[in-house]
Amino acid sequence: KVQKGFDLYSAALPVGLAGFFLNATLYKTLGVVLPAAPSADTLQVASRLTVNLFCGILIGLCIVFALAMGCKPKQYWALLTAPEHVGSVSSQMGTEVFLMNVGVFGLFILAYYNLIGASFNGVTLGIIFCMLCTCNSGSHPGNVWPIMLGYVLASFLAGGLSIVAGGNFTFVINAQAIVVGLCFANGLSPITSKYGWFWGMVAAVMHYFLVTSVPNLHGGFCLY
């Protein structure tokens, strides 16, 4: 009720508030230093070819099965151009359309992370499939591309402002924190569906600037 259905990760707010309470109670109030998380540099990076082959084959099979189940291009196009957010793709448009969305959206995500030069470690691989979890809840390339664009624009904007202010800018578009942040920004796709691509992009820019500071509030007790 708080976010009115405009964030598909509906558990994020209550869990985040609980994490904020735990961080404040167990660490901040008691004056205990919160243990630092391991640096992203310590994560093992997989071969880009291996990850692309694994994801490409697995996700591509979803497209094959969707076609075998009778999914037509016009059915999937109806999802991409739906005037309202489709809250349950499988029940409203059919299981074959849902599977097609998993395949097409999955390849779309994979292409984006390749394009920005993201490191394919365990975290990155995990968030690809985390984003795919929203396929049945209505996320698809048509309402997520403005969010991706918003993140890219926000990265350049923040970098430029940092230079002017004499700051030490580290949150480039392929930084691990920003790569993960996009995963959760993906949940804002209902904003694009209802208000259009521009406001979806604006929501993504706002999310980019907030996501760098939220972990300081909940202290890592919440993965969102």
Language model region names:
Residues 1-224:
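Alpha-helical multipass membrane-protein architecture
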